Amino acid sequence: MELLTTIIVCLLAGCGAGLGTGFAGMSAAAVITPMLVTFLGIPAYSAVGIALASDVLASAVSSYTYGKNKNLDIKNGSIMMVFVLIFTVVGSYVAGLLPDKTMGSFSVVMTMFLGIKFIVNPVMTTKEAMQSVDAKKRVVQSIFSGAMIGFICGFVGAGGGMMMLLILTSVLGYELKTAVGTSVFIMTFTALTGSVSHFLIDGDTPDFLVLSLCIIFTLIFARIGARIANKASTKSLNRATGAILIILGVVVLGANYIK
């Protein structure tokens, strides 16, 4: 019975996290962490490490799908990624010094806020408009944005997907598909750095079964989500992304309430 419960929880967590990653560039940690803590009793800091590890392959396969459809900006994304990686380690260390509850609430609020934003105020920027932004200005913005996102990534226990999506669309002026593609590309590396940092700082060996199941299920559903997202129109993608984020936000909020 305990094994069945573990499989079901990991399946649901992986499904939500994978679709969120592939469809909206959301970090798997925003969904997986509270699910593991609430229903399997895994310590929050260890759950964050498992969630970030699940993020790595899910983000990688999603970024490959977006890149194949020419919805990925590797050049500018790489600049942001360097600073994200540096500050991810700092944020991860600070997170280990704080209570569990401090780590969980931010992701939920950010997820629901972005969900509402995409429905009420959809991102309709075109690739042409995106490319017209001054290159030097974008480099400076990427550096400061990367530092902030990296710290939040390590601190909250998320790949920084929601923060990156918000900044890429609202601050750097990316069109939605390219923003999601670039976000998951960066998140592949931030999640890898964050998960290794969490496991090293935590010192305990994570539950291998839970880790394996979360990685597999998240990867499968991320692939499905990314393929659907790349075929959708911008208007439909905004609505679908908003709906998914709000639903996942409510589910995670419910999990936290049960806890």
Residue map of PLM features:
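Transmembrane helix boundary and interhelical junction motifs in multipass membrane proteins
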Residues: 23-32, 157-167
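Alpha-helical transmembrane segments of polytopic integral membrane proteins
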Residues: 33, 53, 57, 112, ...
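Membrane-interface alpha-helices at helix entry/exit sites of multi-pass transporters
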Residues: 42-50, 75-79, 173-184
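Short, structured loop/turn "capping" segments at alpha-beta junctions
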Residues: 126, 158-163, 174-178
